[in-house]
């Protein structure tokens, strides 16, 4: 009689990483032992994807509106160098994800993929579609999953509410927190969803689907490593004109490793602030830049959005020209800024990027489901890159402007 409450308790409070790994292994085992039984549990994966599909439009709308409405005045003036580094780094990350996807195209096995989209004819048609999606009725945009329209109306509402009373902003913030809590509940069922998705995928298509996931994971992790070890050090070098790698290694070791296991930029904020203190950075700078970075500095999320979106594109055989690819980089970097503070946030914004190519919401949400299957590693690596870069760029901006209290060790003053 006590078994069900115990299982529900473990599902709610246990390690989500271990649970997803267990669901992955259990799904593979069931598909190998009894393919028919594996197909019968496919509804668990379908139910999980439908839940995500239902909550994603509301989540994006509320979070973007709340973020813009509650934006603190004067942050741009005090934080301009850090903000520039954050935005440049996020855009370059999206661009690297796009380039990597073209160098090593990922093609997956998706249900109804052949009929799931209407490919655009080029950048002109993409912009034409984009324009009409922007002016869509907001209720219709929410009902149909038109993420471009949702983003536009949320931004407009956020700007309109920016000068509203603190009570209104507090209510909007409480609403966003409530929606985020609903998402967290849905995410807790990810292990069950992954179990159903993997069992059905292997029973239906064999191990070819998982091999496709391994290729996808290799492209994602390769792009993130390239950003962490090549692009970010180059950005820091251009800012401080000295060897960036002592600082890079310190940020990866003391911030990235912790973030990898917590899988939360918000949870890693105290770790980052302590590291900034050890580096001798001014508290009035990092006390603002670190929480801000946890919100908008999303290099890992930009890579995830661009790579998984182009995986859907290549799976469907959609031709993408250079201007459209650049537009995707921009959209992915902007969308990534809205992925903070939400479990699986970057995955839930994939439909926004997929809509540029006329890919249906059903197919886009299948890509989201694939993201959850590989999320045990992908989300951890993404968070590690996001969070460690917060400290890295804050330190780079402070060092470049001489905004350092004391030289902490040799990290701040090491020359090339």
UniProtKB/Swiss-Prot annotation:
Q: What is its main location?
A: membrane
Any single GO molecular-function term of the entry would be: neutral L-amino acid:sodium symporter activity
Tell me which domain of life the UniProt entry assigns to the organism this sequence originates from.
Bacteria
Record's keyword terms, sorted: Amino-acid transport, Cell inner membrane, Cell membrane, Membrane, Symport, Transmembrane, Transmembrane helix, Transport
Which membrane topology describes this protein?
Answer: Multi-pass membrane protein
Segment forming the signal sequence:
none
- Give the record's GO CC terms: plasma membrane
The yes or no answer to whether the keyword Membrane is present is: yes
Concerning InterPro entries, the annotation shows: Na-dicarboxylate_symporter, Na:dicarbo_symporter_sf, Ser_Thr_transp_SstT
According to its UniProt entry, one GO biological process term is: serine transport
Q: What reaction does this catalyse? A: L-serine(in) + Na(+)(in) = L-serine(out) + Na(+)(out); L-threonine(in) + Na(+)(in) = L-threonine(out) + Na(+)(out)
- Indicate yes or no for the key word Transmembrane helix: yes
**Membrane-spanning intervals of the chain:** 14-34, 43-63, 82-102, 141-161, 192-212, 220-240, 298-318, 339-359, 363-383
Q: Which residues form a coiled coil?
A: none
Where found, per UniProt?
Answer: Cell inner membrane
Q: Which family does it belong to?
A: Belongs to the dicarboxylate/amino acid:cation symporter (DAACS) (TC 2.A.23) family.
* Described function: Involved in the import of serine and threonine into the cell, with the concomitant import of sodium (symport system).
Q: What's the name of the protein?
A: Serine/threonine transporter SstT
